[in-house]
Amino acid sequence: MTLDKVTDIYDLQKIARRRVPRMFYDYADSGAWTESTYRDNTDAFEKIKLRQRVARNIDNRSVSTTMIGHDVSIPTALAPVGMTGMQHPDGEIHAARAAEKFGVPFTLSTMSICSIEEVAKATSKPFWFQLYVMRDRGFAADLIGRAKAAGCSALVLTLDLQILAQRHKDVKNGLSAPPKPTIANLINLAFKPAWCLGMLQTQNRSFGNIVGHVKGVEDMSSLGDWTNSQFDPTLDWESVEWIKKHWDGKLILKGVNDVEDAKIAAKLGADAIIVSNHGGRQLDGAAATIDMLPPIVDAVGDQIEIHLDSGIRSGQDIFKAIALGAKSTFIGRAFVYGLGAAGEAGVTKALQLLKKELDLTMALAGETDINEVGYQNLLTPPATARKVFVPKAKPEAKAPAKPRAKPAAAKPAAAKSKTAAAAKTTAKRTTARRKPASKKTES
């Protein structure tokens, strides 16, 4: 299938599955444990039904908006995805260029294949950088400094990866640093000639932000030992304060999927949060993000900008997220499929599909401005939204109390005697009417 035949993100996924080696395709297209949350993320979007409106002027539509003050052509950004450069040679550079040309933010992962400096050299506009807080805080501070030097305009701090969840496909595929491919995966590589040729033509085949920037980490073998020991289980809200002291730009907190955590994040003064469950790759059994969005919006929507990721596969999904209160969204797998399918052109195709689907959905819902989309566009929102947004019934108005009757004035004695006599006569007549007729005795 060629790009001109592609009609949705799932078509790009099919092409990527054919072109990308199994161990790297499975890395992107998998979840933790039973993958229940991974599946729920997309299923929850499908359960939301929209109101179809007709006979409304839907000319001159606009899907452009802003994210933390940055103009964007559609309400989405490319999410940080580790090892993007293994989906396609120099993958981060291809994705960043596509995002820049399309007018949406690109977020580079700490665990990228291409380094911060390489992506900055290949692009002309600021991109965003995602940070994992490592045990080696000196290295974390160095990463922040490098992001500043590269002109990154926002820092995305990931909070939900203090410890790595088990992803069965990665274990079975031997995906590690260095990789330990199985015989089956080696055979699979033989059937991916275009990918193999492309990887031979680039020098970027390791974690570019780490190798050569950490003392003692000079190759894939030493990288594996260092990486396994660096994810920090002690990361807490005080650590976020530490990050803020080192980063004086826009700060986005990623991985919030609980109301109480959202409240804490808002109090810390971050510019935005991303309602996220890491695409179902961390806590299997966690709630779908679109289900958690309404109560989080209700709790802190007036205090902080709210974005959402996990489960978005179409422009209609973006529309539903906006209708439920998100300012914007992040896409991960949706752009990774495009990247694996056709590099920069594939990412551009993914963004074009999302924009077209978003625009058509908005039009058929009777709206012309994405910034005006809201709860009024939903017919059957998630149960969590119904609890939050449905107006509470007003208490029924009580009937006005009747005024107490004033006590009657005392009647003179003569009047009393006449009244008593009249009552006595009336009683006799009533008794006479009620007296049954006499019956004859049966023989």
Regions found by a protein language model. Give the residues of each.
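Short, conserved beta-strand segments within well-ordered enzyme catalytic domains
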Residues: 49, 64-66, 75-79, 105-109, ...
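A gly/proline- and charged-residue-enriched helix-loop-helix capping module
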Residues: 101-122, 126-140
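Intrinsically disordered, polybasic Lys/Arg-rich low-complexity tracts
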Residues: 392-443
